[in-house]
Amino acid sequence: MKSWVIGNWKLNPTSLEQVQHLVTDLVEGVDAQTRSMDNCHLMLAPSFLHLSPVQQALNANSSTLKLAAQDVSALSAESGAYTGDVSAKQLKDMGVQWVIVGHSERRQYYKESNAVLLKKLLNSAEQGLGVILCIGESESDFEAGHTEQVLDEELQVIADFLQQLKPEQAGYAEQNLIIAYEPVWAIGTGKVPSVEQVTQIHRFIRQQLHSFDNKLDTTPVIYGGSVKPENAADFAASDQINGVLVGGAALQADSFLAIAKCFNN
C-alpha cells in the first residue's frame, strides 16, 4: 500500500504571492528530489480561495501532486441558496480530487456533528471525490482512557455512510476513503503520542472498519498532530501508519518533502 503525505495549509498563507512561491517550491522539489517516489502519494489542501491558482500551477508543471479541499458543503452536492458554501460539484470542476471532512477544528468551532459529516460524505461520493475523515480525542478523554470510546463514536458515521450509498456506488468507500487519526491535544501543540500509542490506536481503528465491512481492510489510516521531519521516520517505521496529515510543516517545501521521503522508504 502506498503511503499518503497530505499537507493541510489551513488558513495559510495570507497572500497569493506566498501561495505561488510555496507551490512552485513544492513542484520543483518533487521534480528534483522525488521523481522516484513510487511508494508515496503527495497531496496539498490549500484554502478554498487558493485552490484555483494551486491547481493551475500543478497542471502547468504536469505535477503528480494531488489536490484536496479543506471542507465541502453538507447542504448540496451541486448548487443552491447556501451563502458561503462550496459544493462537491464545484470542487470537482476546479480539479479537486479529495476533501477533508471532520477536522477537529471544524468539530470544535462549527460544532459539526456526525449527522452533518454524513451529508458531506454522501455529497462527496455523489461527485466521486475521495474523503479524508479526521477523528481524534481530546486530552481529557485521552488521560481518562476514553480514546477508543470517542473514536468508535466518530467512526459510526462510516457505518451510516455505507448503509446509505446507492447500488451504483458500490466499491466507492474502499477506493476513496482515508482515515486520519489526529488526537486533538497533539495538533499544533508540540505534544506527540508515542509511535507505540499511535500504532495501537490504528489497530483499533482498523478493527472498527473491518466490523463495518471487510472490504475496508485496505483503507489507509494516517496520523496527524505535530508531525515534523524530526519525527516522521519514527511514524513511517510502523506498518500500521500509512502516512501523515501535516499542518505547520507543510508550509515549508523542504520540511514537507523531507517528511514525504520518510514515507517513501
UniProtKB/Swiss-Prot annotation:
Signal peptide limits: none
Subcellular location: Cytoplasm
InterPro entries in alphabetical order: Aldolase_TIM (IPR013785), TIM_sf (IPR035990), TrioseP_Isoase_bac/euk (IPR022896), Triosephosphate_isomerase (IPR000652), Triosephosphate_isomerase_AS (IPR020861)
Single GO MF annotation: triose-phosphate isomerase activity
Positions contributing to substrate binding: N8, W9, K10, G188, S226, G247, G248
GO biological-process terms attached to the record: gluconeogenesis; glyceraldehyde-3-phosphate biosynthetic process; glycerol catabolic process; glycolytic process
Family matches, as SUPFAM superfamilies: Triosephosphate isomerase (TIM)
Main location: cytoplasm
Pathway noted in the entry: Carbohydrate biosynthesis; gluconeogenesis; Carbohydrate degradation; glycolysis; D-glyceraldehyde 3-phosphate from glycerone phosphate: step 1/1
Catalyzed reaction equations: D-glyceraldehyde 3-phosphate = dihydroxyacetone phosphate
GO-annotated cellular components: cytosol
Active site per database record: H103 (electrophile), E182 (proton acceptor)
Pfam families assigned: TIM
EC annotation from Swiss-Prot or TrEMBL: 5.3.1.1
Keywords: Cytoplasm, Gluconeogenesis, Glycolysis, Isomerase
Family to which the UniProt record says this protein belongs: Belongs to the triosephosphate isomerase family.
Quaternary assembly: Homodimer.
Described purpose of this protein according to its UniProt entry: Involved in the gluconeogenesis. Catalyzes stereospecifically the conversion of dihydroxyacetone phosphate (DHAP) to D-glyceraldehyde-3-phosphate (G3P).
Protein name, UniProt field: Triosephosphate isomerase
UniProt organism field: Psychrobacter sp. (strain PRwf-1)
Gene field: tpiA
